[in-house]
Amino acid sequence: VLGANEEFNQSLEKAGRATGLSSSHARDLARGTLISAARLLDQTNEEPDELIRKVASPGGTTEAALNVLCKEGAGLDELVLAAVEAAHQRSKELG
């Protein structure tokens, strides 16, 4: 879904500002996070699950964030599925 990464980046920036980061620091961290993730996916043959295991230290900040994003029944998977289904339905309507 084109625009999803940009939307996620915007959400990361907003969250950074909401937790006290300056606008420029929030922007830099959000963009750096997405760029680094894209590079890892592009430059390795590893599956996303394996990369997640490598970057999420047990008890660390990444793991804490992923626990929220991946909460079953109310997490990122459900949001992404709903977004893809909406785009798919609209595509069918448009022909």
Question: In which residue ranges do the predicted regions lie?
Answer:
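NAD(P)-dependent Rossmann-like dehydrogenase/reductase catalytic/cofactor-binding core
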Residues: 27-95
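Anionic-ligand binding region
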Residues: 1-27
